[in-house]
Amino acid sequence: MKLTCVLIIAVLFLTACQLTTGEQKDHALRSTDKNSKLTRQCTPVGGYCSRHYHCCSNHCIKSIGRCVAH
């Protein structure tokens, strides 16, 4: 009985390790996508923006849709 429990736990542990390894491969691809987003050029002051992280200055006034200096 104890041996059966140990074997079941070992199989579950190994299965979990394989699933984790499989997720890491996908995570590496997502990381590459994130890095490509980080290498995009930012919008200069006065340019159009919809989010603060689009602007080189990191400041966007959404009401007018323009990047501003901070």
Curated annotation (Swiss-Prot):
Propeptide: 23-40
Keywords on record: Disulfide bond, Knottin, Neurotoxin, Pyrrolidone carboxylic acid, Secreted, Signal, Toxin
GO molecular function list: ion channel inhibitor activity; toxin activity
Cystine bridges: 42-56, 49-60, 55-67
Tissue: Expressed by the venom duct.
InterPro entries: Conotoxin
Keyword Cell inner membrane in annotation: no
Predominant location: secreted
Any GO CC annotation of this UniProt entry: extracellular region
Signal peptide, first to last residue: 1-22
Compartments, as annotated in UniProt: Secreted
Pyrrolidone carboxylic acid: modified positions: 41
Domain notes: The presence of a 'disulfide through disulfide knot' structurally defines this protein as a knottin.
Recorded family membership: Belongs to the conotoxin O1 superfamily.
Designated name of the protein: Conotoxin ArMKLT2-0112
